[in-house]
Regions:
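Acidic/histidine-rich catalytic neighborhood of metal-dependent amide-processing enzymes
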Residues: 2-85, 89, 135
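Short beta-strand-to-loop capping motifs
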Residues: 98, 154-158
Length: 219
């Protein structure tokens, strides 16, 4: 958001200070926009725009607290150019889902070791490389939030679908144990699907999945 509730506290405190008759010397108030979506306002500030030498960050969610620092952020856009690959004869679609994880803010909650469903899905797919064709994968909905829900559709050899789903369920049981303290309600599902369409070529699908597994998540 451009102005969330926590920012509102800081704005109110700053305006109150500017309106007061306190003998503080010169005080400047700095308000920026789009803090959650790219720091556009802060990035547009040019040298000399403000004269003050000391900056107090009033972006706290609690009155009476002042931050001397904040969580950093990095946005990465990765593009994988792939060739559409026809579905192999005898392969059928299976839909996989990891959902209802707790999620959380990528700054405030990143140290709580919560489940990232994108990486959980990628871990399973990595363990099954060579046993499927990737049709699609989608996870997360905000760049500053830990992914709560992820789904993937893969093509699996028809005579291995039951085994593939069984292996996914066994993987799910292990993950539930791994995150039983932080994400007790995380859910998993695997079922046959009527999805149709080409697959991602196997080499790019492999690189894509390996990249998702390798990307750092957490502190």
């Amino acid at each position: 958001t451009t102005l969330g509730a926590d920012d509102g506290i800081g704005v109110a405190a700053t305006l109150a200070l500017l309106a007061s008759d306190l003998n503080t010397g010169k005080v400047e108030g700095l308000f920026t926009i789009s803090e959650e979506t790219g720091m556009d306002g802060a990035n547009a500030i040019e040298p000399g725009f403000i004269e003050s030498r000391t900056l107090l960050n009033l972006d706290s969610e609690d009155e009476g607290q002042i931050f001397v620092g904040c969580a950093g952020g990095l946005d990465t856009t990765a593009t994988f150019n792939y060739t559409a690959e026809p579905v192999k004869p005898g392969f059928k679609a299976v839909e996989l889902r990891v959902f209802d994880a707790i999620g959380g803010h990528s700054g405030d909650d990143i140290n709580k070791e919560r489940a990232n469903t994108v990486q959980i899905m990628a871990r399973f797919l990595y363990s099954e490389l060579g046993n499927f064709q990737l049709a699609k994968m989608k996870g997360g909905n905000k760049k500053n939030a830990i992914a709560r829900d992820t789904e993937a559709v893969v093509y699996v050899k028809e005579n291995d679908i039951d085994g593939f789903i069984s292996r996914f369920n066994a993987f799910a049981a292990d993950v539930r144990k791994e995150f039983h303290n932080t994400d007790p309600d995380v859910k998993f599902s695997a079922e046959r699907s009527e999805f149709s369409g080409n697959a991602v070529d196997s080499e790019v699908a492999k690189r894509f999945i390996m990249a998702l597994v390798a990307i750092n998540h957490g502190v």
